[in-house]
Amino acid sequence: MGILKTILAASLVFGGASSIAVQAEAEQIGYGRLIVNDFLGDGQDRWRSGSIVGSHLYGQPWGGQRPEGFGDLIEMRIMGQVIAPDNLQSPDPTDRPYAGALSIGAHTHFERSGFDIALGADLTLVGPSSGIGDIQTWLHNAFSVAEPSDTVLNNQVGNKLALTGVAEVGYIYELSENARLRPFVEARAGDETLLRAGFDFTLGQFGHDELLVRDPVSGQRYQTTYQNRPGWSFLAGADFAVVQSSIYLPASSGVTIEDTRERYRIGMNWQGESTSVYYGATWLSPEFTGQDEGQVVGAVRIRFDF
């Protein structure tokens, strides 16, 4: 996947200057966020333990579809996540190491010949310097939950800085007024390097004429622009990835990475006049050879318009 990484990096570098110029003239036109946590899925606190992602959109007023120009719509994204062994107090030596990651990035969303395209980059800080371990310790203390032990934190993935390029291309098939199917392909190179293909199915108005952004951990998509059409929506999706590397599973940890991954997800959204509630669940296949089972993570978003 070396060629893939080179192509992604080049496109991001050469597109960066024009994107910054557009953003300087643009206004904020949307926002979105999603909380993902293992406890909200299978009730555990392990592996892909928890994350929160937030997006702010800049560009011309949203007209119901992506612009055709590269850089005309910019998403600024920030994300923090915790990756942990199964036992935060006395981990199995064959389990994955603890990792805290904090990232910030810019992504552009546009349309070409009917295809939805997202292309961007994130700068990710991994390790104790991210402060994620301290935040989790504070939160667990506040809620009287077992915190990561000194052994876990002292053996976490060391400080690293990774530039990650991400590209996704999808195409929407309108099956009916309320049903849509969107197959997609994704390439990622940096903190994790992989190729992924999958689909998203929606029954209802969720995402119709709205910009949806994909959460990197769960694969769930969340709204960043809103048409506020009342009613229920139901979602399902799946994807398969071929994985080359992950800085969250370094060879020095003694853990062997699985070379494929699968994700299967469902979700539902209720949209009222001024309030919406989203919940989704995703089954994640094992990511390393010592992981004896998959896990289910839950995703939630509650939005109020005042």
Where are these regions (language model features)?
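Short glycine/proline- and aromatic-enriched beta-strand/turn motifs that initiate or cap beta-hairpins
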Residues: 23-64, 69-73, 78-90, 239-250
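Short loop/turn motifs that connect adjacent beta-strands in outer-membrane beta-barrel proteins
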Residues: 23-28, 60-73, 111-118, 172-181, ...
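Outer membrane beta-barrel transmembrane domains
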Residues: 31, 39-41, 87-89, 205-306
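Transmembrane beta-barrel strands of outer-membrane/channel proteins
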Residues: 31-37, 74-82, 121-127, 169, ...
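Gram-negative outer-membrane beta-barrel proteins
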Residues: 39-41, 60-64, 82-88, 127-133, ...
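Residues that define the transmembrane beta-barrel architecture of outer-membrane proteins
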Residues: 46-52, 72, 98-102, 117, ...
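Residues on the lipid-exposed face of transmembrane beta-strands in outer-membrane beta-barrel proteins
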Residues: 52-58, 104-110, 123, 165-171, ...
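Long, hydrophobic/aromatic-enriched structural stretches that serve as scaffold segments
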Residues: 69-134
